[in-house]
Curated annotation (Swiss-Prot):
Database matches in InterPro entries: GcfR_halob, GfcR-like, PRibTrfase_dom, PRTase-like
Name of this chain's protein: Transcriptional regulator GfcR
Record keywords: Activator, DNA-binding, Transcription, Transcription regulation
Naturally occurring in which organism (per UniProt): Haloferax volcanii (strain ATCC 29605 / DSM 3757 / JCM 8879 / NBRC 14742 / NCIMB 2012 / VKM B-1768 / DS2) (Halobacterium volcanii)
Record's keyword annotation contains Transcription: yes
UniProt comment concerning the protein's domains: Contains an N-terminal DNA-binding winged helix-turn-helix domain and a C-terminal regulatory domain (or effector binding domain) resembling phosphoribosyltransferase (PRT) domain.
PANTHER family the UniProt entry points to: OROTATE PHOSPHORIBOSYLTRANSFERASE (PTHR19278), PYRE-LIKE PROTEIN (PTHR19278:SF41)
Means of activity regulation: Interaction with effectors modulates GfcR activity. 2-keto-3-deoxy-6-phosphogluconate (KDPG), fructose-1,6-bisphosphate (FBP), 2-keto-3-deoxy-6-phosphogalactonate (KDPGal) and glycerol-3-phosphate (G3P), which are intermediates of sugar and glycerol degradation pathways, can act as inducer molecules.
Gene that produces this protein: gfcR
Gene Ontology process terms (BP): pyrimidine nucleobase biosynthetic process; regulation of gene expression; UMP biosynthetic process
């Protein structure tokens, strides 16, 4: 994806496939607000009358398809994420991947660290409109439980920190202990969430204003 028009077209395609705006946000690595804006723009493109273009959201799109589409590259990045965790944190029992993109990364990390593998589906995957707090996420029963275990959390990007915070809360609610989070890209410069350190391979820093 090279420009906003590509993102709008992708958002339209995903919406036509029945994905919620929260799932679209996850697929395109943008915030929920940006996903909503992209979907609205894709519908506006079919309007017969010209309309004033709405101001776009303040967000950064991260396309890591070159990593995700290659098994070896994904493994190498997973090793780098695992190395970040080993440098500054204790040993975990479970590596929890946040669905969807965080799970393949967590698989590589768990293999490198020799932990079991957990998977968490965040509330945003059900989100289309309204208050996210009215929705709930959950752990997959097909993966390792977190109760009574020390956990690492893995995702691809940090946009606002909402999903990481939700996952941290969910692990604690299940009786587990979140030790640290790790991502490929941090858009916000997040160092910790609710007392849990957040590590990233890449930090995106805005310089000046658009």
């Amino acid at each position: 994806m090279k420009n906003v028009d590509d993102l709008i077209a992708s958002a339209a395609e995903l919406a036509d496939r029945g994905l919620s705006k929260g799932e679209i946000a996850d697929e395109l690595n943008v915030s929920r607000e940006t996903a909503s804006w992209l979907v609205e723009r894709s519908g506006a493109a079919t309007e017969p009358e010209p309309r004033a273009e709405p101001e776009g959201p303040d967000d950064i799109h991260v396309d890591w398809n070159a990593i995700g589409s290659g098994g070896k590259r994904l493994t190498y990045v997973g090793r780098a994420l695992a190395d970040l965790l080993m440098e500054t944190n204790g040993e975990a029992d479970v590596t929890v991947g946040i669905e969807k993109a965080g799970v393949p990364l967590a698989t590589s990390v768990s293999r490198e660290l020799e932990t079991t593998l957990g998977a968490y589906s965040p509330a945003k995957h059900q989100w289309d409109e309204g208050d996210l707090e009215d929705l709930g996420g959950g752990f997959s029963r097909n993966f390792s439980p977190v109760e009574g275990r020390d956990c690492f959390i893995v995702d691809d990007t940090v946009t606002s920190g909402t999903t990481l915070r939700e996952t941290i809360d969910a692990i604690r609610s299940e009786g587990g202990e979140p030790l640290a989070c790790v991502v490929i890209v941090d858009k916000q410069g997040v160092e910790e969430i609710d007392g849990v350190p957040v590590h990233s391979l890449i930090n995106v820093v805005r310089v000046g204003e658009q």
